[in-house]
A protein has these predicted regions:
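Long, acidic/serine-threonine-rich intrinsically disordered regions with weak helical/coil propensity
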Residues: 1-150, 247-343, 353, 420
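Long alpha-helical scaffold regions
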Residues: 1-91, 391, 401-564
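Extended HEAT/HEAT-like alpha-solenoid repeat tracts in very large eukaryotic scaffold/adaptor proteins
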Residues: 81, 106-117, 131, 162, ...
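A cross-kingdom feature marking charged/low-complexity
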Residues: 122-159, 166-209, 368-389, 434-476, ...
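Alpha-helical solenoid scaffolds that mediate protein-protein interactions
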Residues: 142, 351, 362, 384, ...
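Solenoid-repeat scaffolds in large eukaryotic assemblies
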Residues: 155, 160, 169, 176, ...
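Internal alpha-helical scaffold/solenoid segments in large eukaryotic proteins
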Residues: 155, 160-164, 170, 324-333, ...
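Extended alpha-helical solenoid scaffold regions that build the rod-like backbones
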Residues: 192-397, 401, 491, 498-510, ...
């Protein structure tokens, strides 16, 4: 038996000690988390909403009315993604893919429905009188077939004879005028119905019963309403057009009970909408967190409500408030995707309590596939002064470059990490390569080390020795000899490199500073005797000693000639 737990972006599988109660299964199940992140269309939703979120954070808290603008931008992004998903789903022949897109469309429809209702009830906070008008717009937005039927009827040659005519009756009176005259008109129509004035015309009588809000008549038209909340708004329009926000929950529960038969099971969406009608925003957020397949909705809705000053302080047990907790969960999910992780950084930035700590943990898990990506991650860390992460990234890239024998890149990363030990190691590799090949690689980097060469003694020697070669190549022998002597006296040259250094310096032995070279040669001779080097190296020492003696003699002769 195997158990598993979700980790940051991956799954942890572990062995359990449960005894199997029967034979094991023959199937291997593939488990995925946050599968929506891999949808190219839904990634547009995440990217677009990221820009809206960042813009919302820059709005001055002293101007809460401005916070109310982004909610429509969020909804327009939801609508655009949903329409694109519907178009793609209609063209796909793969049944499995089609089902997947269909499920995503259904989820986005539910998200838009809940989001729009939260706008009406919480953000716009429509008062009694105009509340019903907002609810009518809400239902019309999510019951578009009514407008389509009305358009078909009006565009037909004979609208009164169209088969959908009685389904979409149209009036010449605005809703505002209707609201003013409604009570007197309602009493008059009710009186006519009781007198059976319209009994001879079934359709006219049906319309009048609907207009006075007869519940039995409305329920008979269930197939035209399709949902209980459509039935709710219809009932309120004809029975209680000036309903108060505080009474909404009573009518919502009543309509749900009336619309659904006893055998119907209440869907999670119904519970969420009921919670909204009860103005229980915390229950809406809680149920959406459980039902929806990602944290996008609850994270952005909670942030928006927080900016509108509609959320009271609601601290959680581990110190983070609800807004921050949901944003952290959403951002952590984004970090698992190869292109969305950069969006997640901004969400962490706007979580003042735990955002930085979470970002430090997540940024270390970003796979540094390429040097370009590593530079992106590094820039993010440097902008936020995350020194530990900067050093870690640079060390990883330096080690990777060293394994690939890219010494220049490795040295550059180690300098950026300010890692003296690693810079020393790479400098040694440069010197070893020089001994083997007789030339330096990555001359541009070594020539432009600047103050960075002071990071370690070995790096300083590498830079200065390269400078010696440049002086030698430019035939500035005196300056080259002085630099070489300073390297000797500073004792920063590795002893293993003295042989190569003296061999390169032979043409300079005619200078008067040859005594320093002789002392160095004695130390080199002692080292070989102690370590028992091969005869070949000992032969080189003897040749160097011979050359040194010859050049010393020539220098003495020249000096004596000049004195006489």
């Amino acid at each position: 038996h195997m158990g598993f737990a979700w980790g940051p972006g991956d799954i942890l599988v572990y062995e359990t000690h449960f005894k199997p109660s029967g034979p094991g299964g023959s199937f291997i199940h593939k488990v995925k988390k946050d599968e929506d992140i891999n949808s190219p269309i839904l990634r547009k939703l995440f990217n677009e909403s990221h820009h809206i979120f960042v813009g919302l954070q820059t709005i001055n808290d002293d101007l809460p009315s401005k916070s109310k603008r982004p909610h429509r931008n969020y909804r327009s992004v939801i609508r655009a993604c949903m329409e694109e998903l519907q178009q793609v789903a209609g063209k796909i022949l793969d049944t499995e893919k089609g089902t997947q897109y269909g499920n995503q469309v259904s989820i986005l429809l539910a998200i838009e429905l809940i989001w729009n209702l939260c706008e009406v009830l919480f953000i716009d906070a429509a008062p009694a009188g105009s509340l019903l008008l907002h609810l009518l717009d809400w239902v019309r937005l999510h019951k578009a077939d009514v407008d389509e039927k009305a358009k078909d009827v009006l565009q037909s040659d004979s609208p009164a004879e169209h088969h959908n005519y009685w389904d979409v009756p149209s009036g010449t009176q605005t809703l505002t005028e209707f609201d003013v005259k409604w009570r007197n008109w309602h009493e008059e129509v009710d009186r006519y119905l009781k007198d059976n004035t319209f009994a001879s015309n079934h359709h006219l009588e049906l319309i009048c019963k609907i207009l006075v809000g007869d519940e039995d008549t409305l329920l008979e038209q269930k197939e035209l309403l399709s949902t209980w909340y459509h039935f709710l708004v219809t009932r309120l329009l004809y029975s209680h057009p000036t309903v108060k926000p505080t009474d909404l929950h009573y009518y919502a529960q009543s309509c749900l009970t009336m619309f659904l038969d006893s055998r119907s099971v209440q869907e999670p969406l119904d519970s969420i909408l009921l919670a909204a009608f009860e103005f229980d925003i915390y229950l809406v957020i809680k149920d959406c967190s459980i039902v929806l397949n990602n944290w996008w909705f609850v994270a952005h809705l909670t942030d928006l409500l927080d900016h509108c000053k509609l959320l009271q302080s609601h601290n959680l047990n581990f110190g983070s408030n609800m807004r921050e907790f949901l944003l952290l969960e959403y951002a952590s999910g984004l970090f698992t995707h190869h292109s969305l992780w950069q969006c997640a950084v901004d969400y962490f930035d706007h979580c003042p309590e735990l955002g930085r700590a979470c970002l430090e943990l997540q940024i270390e898990r970003v796979p540094l596939d390429t040097e370009r990506k590593a530079l992106k991650v590094l820039r993010i860390c440097e902008e936020r002064q995350m020194s530990e992460q900067v050093r870690s990234i640079c060390k990883i890239m330096a080690m990777r470059a060293l394994r690939n024998n890219r010494l220049g890149s490795a040295l550059s990363w180690s300098i950026r990490a300010k890692d003296a030990a690693f810079a020393t190691l790479i400098s040694e590799r440069f010197l070893q390569d020089y001994c083997a090949k007789g030339t330096f690689s990555d001359l541009d980097l070594i020539d432009n080390l600047g103050p960075a060469m002071l990071l370690s003694d070995r790096l300083t020697f590498l830079g200065k020795y390269r400078e010696f070669h440049k002086l030698y190549g430019e035939k500035r022998f005196k300056e080259a000899a002085k630099l070489l002597l300073s390297l000797m006296t500073a004792k920063i040259a590795p002893r293993s490199f003295w042989m190569t250094l003296l061999t390169d310096a032979l043409p300079l032995l005619e200078q008067k500073e040859v005594s320093q070279h002789a002392g160095c040669l004695d130390a080199l001779d002692l080292r070989f005797r102690m370590q028992g080097e091969e005869d070949v190296e000992q032969t080189k020492v003897e040749l160097l000693r011979l050359s040194l003696a010859r050049n010393l003699a020539m220098a003495i002769v020249k000096e004596g000639t000049m004195e006489t």
